[in-house]
Amino acid sequence: MKRLLWVDDEIDLLRPHLLFMQGRGYHVDAVSNGDDALELLRLSPYDLILLDEQMPGRSGMEVFDELRRMDARVPVVMVTKSEEDRTMTEAIGRRVADYLVKPTSPRQVLSVVTRLLEGGKIQQQLVARDFASRFRDLNAQRNLPRGWREWCETYSELVDWELRLRDAGETGLLASLETLLDDFRREFCRFVCDDYGAWVNGGPDRPPLSTDIVPQYLAPLLGEDRTVLFVIIDCLRLDQWRALMPILEPFAQVEEAQYYSILPTATPFSRNAIFSGLFPDQISERVPGWWGWDGEGSLNSFEGELFREQVRRVMGTNLPVHYEKVFDAGDGEAMLRRLPSHLAQPGVTAIVFNFVDQLTHGRSESAVLMEVARDKEALRALTRQWFERSEALVAIRDAVLRGVPVLVTTDHGSIHCHRPATVFAKRDTTQNLRYKFGDDLRAEDRSTAFSTNDERTLRFPAGRAATNYLIALEDVFFVYPTKLRQYQARYRGSFLHGGISPEEMVLPVALLTRR
């Protein structure tokens, strides 16, 4: 039985309330002053305290401060006759759990107490009930044909269910959801394999792709007298983004949409496509020597120039463009020193934050990181912990509070890979575990990869003769027959990217404006 302590100098007038709460299964102790309340609290703990704000002798606020020193965790509901904003602001500022204005009805009190003491349990029950009902519908719809819009909606809903079930502690239902997600992921991969070539070659009704971020989402915010901040958090999954939204929502209105990354879902291709508005074959034409299989990091050396050229091409004028890349705390501090001057003048400032990508890559190489970020939930938690203390949040908040709109997106996501797939190739192939380019390249099991020898399907520059392209499907990672067991053990359970999956391809793009 939950124990309540009610403190009010007019407690005799509240007998109907006390009887009502007792009839609802609560044990209620009632006292008329703060000293008696503190004495009872010293003798035994309570689950919730209802505290009158205006009492003779010690005021409710004084008693509240003493209660907090004795028990910092017990929720306190402040009850007062005052409707002044100052009183409410002071109570909220001192972190009271809730605030009631007299006269109160028994049902008002019950509602507040139930929410504070039983709310989590009730929400858990409702989430479980709602998911069980929705699960039947989703399960029946697994094999129905979907277009790109329906896939965005379906994957977005599955992400929301995962977060809600995780918050509710419904581990059993999470297992059912994971099975459902596996089935949907398989169908999504088939959908992309069938339609991707048409998307990148001018087919009708294609989704917004990496190449469309600037013209479709950023350009409407730009203008001669406008200032915009453009933030790219490298390697951010949709579920990670949704975990960050509660940090932003207290000061920003968030309008979220989704777009599709181009293939491969890796920084050299997807992020270059965002900054240039071009596919790889088009970039290669404009930047001779850009295209190569070795040294992937160098493929992103021209982002600033490509971005300036795209803004000029899309807007038809030379707007001021600033480009920043943040790899570490030193880069972040330097960026924050420059940012105020950028935000004080018209133009666009683009900032790339690499922490999440570094975390994802480093996890595969570090036993400590592998243990700390062992699954999706842990990866979300680490991402949130970083963001709360990051220069990214400082930059976004500063811009929003200045009235500068902020467009936030990512270049690709990642997927938790569990299944190795053997590939056979010559030595001159790419090193990525989710995609391979090379001569005489094939997968032992053809169902594990999207395979083509036509570079036009991926909008790649014309390469050498007999070049094959393999892109991993679902949660597969590629291994060679040599050192097979070693690489299986090393990379199984890694978060990787470069392949085809909703986790890597269906990505957030969000506009943040001041509340």
What are these regions (language model features)?
Residues 54, 86-89, 114, 119-515:
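Feature captures the catalytic ectodomains and active-site-proximal regions of enzymes
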Residues 104-113:
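C-terminal output helix
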Residues 62, 83-98:
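Alpha4 helix (beta4-alpha4-beta5 surface) of REC/receiver domains from two-component response regulators
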Residues 45-50:
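Active-site beta3 strand of CheY-like receiver
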Residues 39, 61-72:
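Short amphipathic alpha-helix used as the core "switch/output" element in two-component signaling
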Residues 32-36, 59-62:
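Acidic catalytic/metal-coordinating carboxylates
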